[in-house]
A protein has these predicted regions:
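Alpha/propeptide regions of enzymes that mature by internal proteolysis
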Residues: 22-376
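Bacterial Sec-dependent N-terminal signal peptides
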Residues: 1-22
Length: 376
């Protein structure tokens, strides 16, 4: 066998292996929607946004973590950002909801973790905010902390997350590429009966529609009948009945950030569209699911100063008529972020020997190929 033939055989056998090792949906030629993703296809494509994660994967039964999302690099309490929260199904323990609903702004990093670690995360965020320069006189802080219940794989009753873990996630937050799958707050989560986790995606609007970026990050821990690019994957795999075993205490946290100048009213409208993205994947917002969407505008011109001598606030706001492209971007990015969390997931064994298999990507890709959904 000559050298050229040997190299050809090597590539013939190794390329399928490399392809299946790739962890994101688009790496396999599957495109969701019609809008273009950002450079990284992550929430950090939104200028200034930072994400930090702390993964706690120890011993036989600790499978949990922290994911922190910072809308900008400054003092968020002193420079608040417009925000809204939409509740798709309210079986959850989202801290900070009522003040965001009332005032329409966010004043801390957004933290995602497990259900029983919400109080710990709130304490950590309060401490972090109090210690920021210029916050010496602050007496009230609205920490926003979301959660899903990772108790099937994780010893959630052990409450292993500490304030130091939360602070590490915040302090290590950065722009640029980020990890997906079984990392951070997604370490022990389950989605459609397969290993879920953290997923992210982004969309950039055409210049004629404003050129704005929408980024989405999800923590997937919910059930339903999985669909990928419109293909009934869960039904074809005969796996959908298994997904309901894990859904009663499941949830999906969705964080939508955009540099479009939006007020809290239109941010709530934007947040509602994330639920449409969830439904495109086969999610059903079950009785026991806490499906929350946190939407934030990072536009610098829209920031809200903590203190101001001017009682009138002049803030640029996108007109209602310009919202439709942003709605589409949110739907597409949410759908792809959820699927990315599944494609990045790896089989995991956790508490009491419980085992959750990764999505069988080979079988899924073959179904998509047969349905004509692959670009290559």
């Amino acid at each position: 066998m000559n050298g050229l033939h040997q190299r050809f055989c090597f590539l013939f056998f190794i390329l399928p292996i490399l392809m299946l090792a790739q962890s994101r949906l688009r790496d396999h030629g599957v495109e969701v929607g019609v809008l273009r993703p950002g450079t990284l296809n992550t929430i950090t494509d939104v200028p200034g946004v930072k994400v930090g994660q702390f993964t706690l994967n120890q011993g036989d039964d600790i499978r949990t973590g922290i994911t922190a999302i910072l809308p900008h690099s400054g003092n968020i309490f002193q420079e608040k950002v417009p925000a809204a929260i939409y509740v798709g199904n309210g079986f959850g323990k989202l801290a900070g909801y009522t003040q965001v609903k009332e005032l329409g702004n966010l004043e801390t990093p957004i933290i995602l973790t497990n259900t029983l670690s919400v109080p710990t995360a709130v304490n950590a965020v309060i401490g972090y905010t109090l210690n920021q320069p210029e916050n010496e006189n602050v007496r009230s802080i609205n920490a926003v902390v979301g959660e899903t219940n990772d108790g099937y794989l994780n010893d959630i009753r052990g409450r292993h997350i500490t304030e130091e873990h939360v602070l590490k996630a915040i302090e290590n937050a950065s722009t640029g590429p980020m990890s997906e799958g079984s990392v951070g707050a997604g370490t022990g989560t389950i989605c459609f009966g397969f290993k879920g986790g953290i997923g992210t995606s982004s969309r950039v609007l055409p210049k004629q529609s404003g050129g704005y970026t929408v980024g989405v990050l999800v923590q997937t821990n919910f059930g339903g009948v999985l669909q990928v690019a419109g293909v009934e994957v869960g039904k074809k795999l005969g796996h959908y009945s298994d997904s309901f075993k894990y859904s009663p205490d499941g949830s999906c946290m969705m964080v939508v950030l955009t540099d479009a100048p939006l007020d809290s009213r239109n941010l709530e409208r934007l947040a509602k569209r994330a639920m449409l993205g969830l439904s495109h994947t086969g999610g059903i917002a079950s009785n026991g699911s806490g499906d929350y969407v946190i939407a934030v505008s990072t536009a610098e011109a829209c920031r809200i100063p903590y203190e101001s001598e001017n009682p009138i606030q002049n803030v640029p706001t996108l007109r209602n008529e310009a919202m439709t492209p942003l709605f589409l971007a949110t739907i597409e990015a949410t759908e792809e972020a959820i699927l990315n969390s599944l494609f990045a997931g790896e089989t995991m064994i956790g508490r009491d020997g419980h085992k959750i298999e990764a999505l069988p990507k080979e079988k899924v890709l073959e179904m998509l190929r047969e349905a004509g959904k692959l670009d290559r």
